[in-house]
A protein has these predicted regions:
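Residues lining hydrophobic/aromatic ligand-binding pockets adjacent to catalytic sites
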Residues: 1-130
Length: 130
């Protein structure tokens, strides 16, 4: 088993961070559609052995009326609010997930954190959606 130690986000300049830690969890991917060029730059700058994990974009997990969307630069059309979040099996959630997968592939990430809000709850229906 290999142990990874890192932070949620870069707490130091990236060049320094890569010499101190061997993993980072990218939280910025939660708030907005991942910036592909930025992710490519992260992967290029990091040592080959450096590991990335990222949070899935909130369009997959969080309905549009939750406060986490206040930090987002790109908010989907509010008229489609019942089509986003809660891991719903909708075209919009699947398209959002494809963007997460693309980001993970660019980073060669081994882990994608799917963080659901407390309102997702534990019920038979939500467990089945997993």
């Amino acid at each position: 088993m290999k142990t990874y130690v890192g932070c949620c986000g870069y707490c130091l300049a990236r060049s320094k961070y890569y010499t101190v830690f061997n993993v980072v969890e990218l939280q910025e991917t939660f708030y907005d559609i991942p910036d592909i060029d930025k992710l490519k730059r992260y992967r290029y700058e990091a040592p080959e052995s450096f590991a990335f994990s990222l949070k899935a974009w909130q369009a997959v997990t969080h309905p549009l009326d939750l406060p986490t969307w206040r930090k987002a630069k790109n908010v989907p059309d509010k008229s489609l609010s019942n089509r986003y979040g809660f891991l719903r099996p909708t075209k919009e959630v699947f398209e959002a997930w494809e963007k997460v997968v693309e980001a993970a592939e660019i980073l060669n990430a081994k882990v994608v954190v799917i963080q659901t809000p407390p309102s997702f709850g534990i019920a038979k229906k939500t467990i089945e959606m997993l």
